Amino acid sequence: LLRQKRPIVNIGIIGTGSIASRFVPEPKNVNSASVSVAYNPNQEKCVSFCEKFLIPIVARDLEELYENCDAVYIASPHYTHYEYAKSALNAGKSVLCETPFVFSKKQAEELYSIAEKKELLLQIALKTAYCPAFGHLFSLLKSGVIGEIVEVNASVTTLTDENSAKLDSKYFGGIM
């Protein structure tokens, strides 16, 4: 299925940070997808990103990005997701958006309404729950091999500067 001949979907990337860096290699595993263009308001960072990943087009603005892609992957700062997703949908592009998707139910409903009216896809990039290791873990849990589950503790740790903008729920949704 992954190797069937299909028209290539050209993907445009909004945001060129570490999350986007992890995304770029993935379409190479599917013969019908290619990253064709990237955009970052910081053009210097965008040029560097495109050179590193051999992305042919550095978009100067969103209009140029939309002209050169079929779908958009959003990996920009969290507080920009809503505006970028709305802009892409209104430009007729399907959207894959990193988490957190948006900051309110109202924003989510509005974006899904636009996508539905325009018959576009709007997807949250929630990959972990669908990776093979997670599926295997759940099958082990359901099989009883591990025994009765009485408690689950999970954590993600990282050293974050207490003044980091990522802790500001207004702009990043907060990581706490």
Residue ranges with predicted function:
Residues 37-39, 59, 73, 150-153:
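Residues embedded in well-ordered beta-strands within globular domains across many folds
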Residues 33, 70, 93, 120-121, ...:
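Short, well-ordered coil/turn segments that N-cap beta-strands
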Residues 109-127, 148-152:
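Rossmann-fold dehydrogenase core element
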Residues 15, 99, 144:
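Conserved G/P- and acidic residue-centered "switch" motifs that form tight phosphate/ATP-binding loops
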Residues 1-53:
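N-terminal Rossmann-like dinucleotide-binding module
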Residues 53-112:
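Beta-loop-alpha module in the N-terminal Rossmann-like domain of NAD(P)-dependent dehydrogenases
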Residues 128-176:
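Predominantly a Rossmann-like dinucleotide-binding segment in NAD(P)-dependent oxidoreductases
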Residues 33-37, 72, 173-174:
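Short active-site oxyanion
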